[in-house]
Amino acid sequence: VAAGPPAQISTLILPADVSWSDGAAATTAPTAGVSPAAAGEVVANIAKVLNSGTKTALLLGGRVLREEGLRAASRIAEKTGARLFCEVFPTRLQRGASVPHVERIAYLAEMASVQLEEFENLILVDAKAPVSFFAYPDKKSYLVPEHCTVHKLVEPEQDALKSLHALVDAVAAAHTQPKLPALDRPSLPGGKLTAAKVCQAIGALLPENAIISDEAQTSGVMLPAFTANAPKHDLLTLTGGAIGQGLPVAVGAAVACPDRPVLALAGDGSAMYTNQALWTMVNEDLDITVIILNNRSYAILNVELERVGAEGAGSKAKSQLDLSEPPIDFVALAQSQGMTATSVSTSRGFNRALENAFRQPGPHLIEAIVPSEFKGLKLKALPHILGALDSVPAPLAKAIKKKVAP
């Protein structure tokens, strides 16, 4: 069952006496089943949609977000004019120089609606139709526009990569060159440190073949833009909205790939869920650089509190999302678990700390003291901007989306 399509995590429940009883005889491991590709008729119908001249987008997920799948999808896009998107929180996304770019659906539902509004067809490739992360008053949760038809290339038990290659052939794109971005790092930032400048410095200094575990929340909104043309890397994101998974995921990545540098980004609030991962990083001597983006607030939850209509929250309720009293000393927290750590509040200091961490193998922590903002906007203003997107012309809405969350 565990090896058959669609292979997923399985749980084996054993009786307690297995610990002291005689072991069973070894057996031959079963051969993993081979998943079929999508039916030829399905592929042909979707090829017709792609060749119809209508505005069409492919929404990618799962294993097709690795380089081979992205190259196949890019061939289709270059041949047919379709746009490429991926899930809000991809499990694993390969990206950077020489890997075709794919735009992530925005976390904020209002901005996701702006992204999808122009399309008449949405083709799902190992992905689900996008929905909002939470339910909001007077807002729809299903984000596909009413005028847009959804098509599904594969079912869960089918091989998405084989099916995507079949679609490449069906639209005669096998000899079409995928669009491959060149290496183009941003410059190192200067001046007062902000979350955007942290992301800029990462793009400027990221090592080749790195793995990024991104749980930066509101502070990481500029990371995709500043690392799009950085050296090739893997991005692991917050699947399922499980705040606190970022540091343990970084541990898992470093154990699985000991020859690759790992970068873990975490907000101060999310880092407190699983700070014991710092001890594991030291105990296992893992090559992980941890960046804590410390704005002394559960900023993402403050935004969501207002967006769900919880108006007039009292001081006691607000204090539960305030991390300034008492302030958390992440340097002391890391050092108490044996980790080299430093705190910075200037871009120059952050650049130097990140260069040193990447240069020296092993676990390091950098606490970046940053203001509570969203791409330069005070977070209090964000819900009001989002609420206005429905009432402005589409070109202006797109411009706002590109400015706030590129």
Name what the model sees in each region:
Residues V1, T27-A29, E68-G81, P137-Y142, ...:
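Short, solvent-exposed amphipathic alpha-helical segments in soluble enzyme
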Residues V1-P5, R104, Q115-E118, L122, ...:
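Conserved thiamine diphosphate
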Residues A2, I13-S98, H175-I243, N275, ...:
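Cofactor-pocket helix-loop regions in the catalytic cores of large enzyme subunits
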Residues P5-I9, S52-K55, E78-R83, E117-N121, ...:
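Short coil/turn connectors at secondary-structure junctions
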Residues I9, I13, A25, D126, ...:
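Phosphate/pyrophosphate-binding active-site segments
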Residues L14-P15, G61-G62, E87-F89, A127, ...:
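Cofactor-binding loop segments of dinucleotide-utilizing enzymes, especially the Rossmann-like FAD-
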Residues G62-L153, A228-R260, M272-Q276, R307, ...:
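Glycine-rich, anion-gripping cofactor-binding loops and their flanking helix/strand elements
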Residues V221-P406:
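Thiamine diphosphate
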